[in-house]
């Protein structure tokens, strides 16, 4: 595929979900002539025989979707999509660096206002059940908005892992008194507008410096207009074995610092502060004996990965080990996953995606080298798989090639998200 064809295809992927929203069961008017020719050329290049939106306007993209999913799932046919020449230049093929990404793939922040206006009211680009219509004037403002500045509920990013229980599920434990002789217990939980962390203790804790580890799913958060104070409440229940009424004359009882800011923040102060939770830890300095403590940071939270090029280059994923699905791709994959579950094909497609991903990595490695990579996350968790690819131990695979692999896999996943919603079992 030539560079120009690739650029056209990338642009098409950005808005292809719009097709389904502009057609009814009797009419289909979502495509321009340029869209049709670009999509037809693409389908011809990947050898998809039947192009549904041309020969059956009553079921747009459906026949093509079935062909495409079959194409992805068949080991002997999907090799074309994995070849490095998807990234070839017309003049000088070069796949060992990410110059192609930096130069030819348009970063999010350089997108023109007209592009934003074109997409801002497309229902299918919004995974919410009730799409929000945004006026054209607000659309212009949105085009100049800081990426990732949309408020986020800290509870929505909380997760459980092998060694850490979930968020709400900690409520019962926090509201149960510690048994006699129990060790001190540190915790970090979140409500809709706050993060609460601290240490529960049966005995007074001497003044000192203490470190609260921040889980990866909270380490991508910024908070602005924040106030910091002692509390003993979580989701309407009392946190046991914490003290909220300690005094230290006119001096602060405790301060906190975060790795991204050297200034201490006073706990129980009227100060309004902004801080980032990246860096992996919150440092608590106490000035008096405390029989346990719980500190709340209450404010407006948002994602702190505001380096827009990371949308394509994933540079943010090299900075922190986040497991948040920060691209929102899972929501677009959900219609396809529902269809897979209904047809009993979930497992076989999952195996196909694992095989496809391993074959893709093999394309970027020297010949006859084993791909010893194990994915612990399902195929539809794109950012977690991206992190695994970026960090897995393979010295023969340079970092630049890993970024290309992820960009390559991102495009394949985008195709699945687009075409999968029309997939039907033959």
From Swiss-Prot:
It is found in: Virion; Host cytoplasm. It holds the Pfam family Phytoreo_P8. Its main location: virion. One of its GO terms (biological process) is fusion of virus membrane with host plasma membrane. GO terms for cellular component: host cell cytoplasm; viral envelope; viral outer capsid. Keywords: Capsid protein, Host cytoplasm, Outer capsid protein, Virion. One of its GO terms (molecular function) is host cell surface receptor binding. It comes from the Viruses. InterPro entries: Capsid_hemagglutn, Phytoreo_P8, Virus_capsid_a-hlx_vir. Belongs to the phytoreovirus outer capsid protein P8 family. Homotrimer. Homomultimer. Capsid protein which self-assembles to form the outer icosahedral capsid with a T=13 symmetry, about 70 nm in diameter and consisting of 260 P8 trimers. Mediates the secretion of assembled virus-like particles from host insect cells. This is Outer capsid protein P8. The lineage of its organism: Viruses, Riboviria, Orthornavirae, Duplornaviricota, Resentoviricetes.
């Amino acid at each position: 595929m030539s560079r120009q064809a690739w650029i056209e295809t990338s642009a098409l992927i950005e808005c292809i979900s719009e097709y389904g929203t502009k057609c009814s069961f009797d009419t289909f008017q979502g495509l321009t002539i340029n869209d049709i020719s670009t999509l037809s050329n693409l389908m011809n290049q990947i050898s998809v025989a039947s192009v549904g939106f041309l020969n059956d306007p009553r079921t747009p993209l459906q026949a093509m979707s079935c062909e495409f999913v079959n194409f992805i799932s068949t080991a002997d046919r999907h090799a074309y999509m994995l070849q490095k020449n998807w990234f070839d230049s017309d003049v000088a093929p070069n796949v060992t660096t990410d110059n192609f990404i930096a130069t030819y793939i348009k970063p999010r922040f350089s997108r023109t206002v007209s592009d934003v206006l074109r997409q801002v009211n497309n229902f299918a680009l919004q995974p919410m059940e009730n799409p929000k219509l945004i006026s054209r004037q607000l659309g212009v403002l949105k085009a100049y908005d800081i990426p990732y500045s949309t408020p986020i509920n800290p509870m929505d990013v909380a997760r459980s892992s092998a060694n850490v229980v979930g968020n709400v599920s900690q409520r019962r434990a926090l509201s149960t008194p510690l048994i006699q002789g129990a060790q001190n217990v540190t915790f970090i939980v979140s409500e809709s507008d706050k993060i609460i962390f601290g240490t529960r203790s049966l005995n007074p804790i001497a003044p000192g410096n203490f470190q609260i580890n921040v889980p990866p799913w909270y380490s991508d958060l910024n908070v602005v207009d924040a106030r910091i104070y002692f509390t003993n409440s979580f989701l309407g229940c009392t946190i046991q074995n914490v003290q909220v009424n300690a005094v230290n004359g006119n001096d602060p009882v405790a301060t906190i610092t975060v790795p991204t800011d050297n200034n201490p923040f006073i706990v129980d102060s009227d100060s309004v502060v902004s801080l980032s939770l990246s860096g992996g830890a919150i440092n608590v300095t106490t000035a008096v004996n405390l029989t346990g403590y719980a500190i709340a940071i209450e404010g407006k939270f948002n994602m702190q990965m505001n380096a827009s090029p990371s949308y394509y280059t994933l540079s943010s994923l090299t900075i922190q080990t986040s497991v948040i699905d920060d691209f929102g791709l899972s929501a677009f994959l959900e219609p396809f996953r529902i269809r897979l579950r209904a047809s009993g094909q979930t497992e076989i497609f999952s195996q196909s995606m694992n095989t496809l991903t391993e074959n893709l990595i093999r394309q970027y490695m020297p010949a006859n080298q084993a791909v010893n990579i194990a994915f612990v996350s399902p195929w539809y968790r794109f950012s977690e798989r991206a992190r695994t690819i970026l960090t897995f131990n393979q010295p023969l695979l340079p970092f630049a090639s890993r970024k290309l692999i992820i960009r390559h896999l991102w495009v394949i996943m985008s195709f699945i998200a687009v075409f999968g919603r029309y997939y039907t079992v033959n």
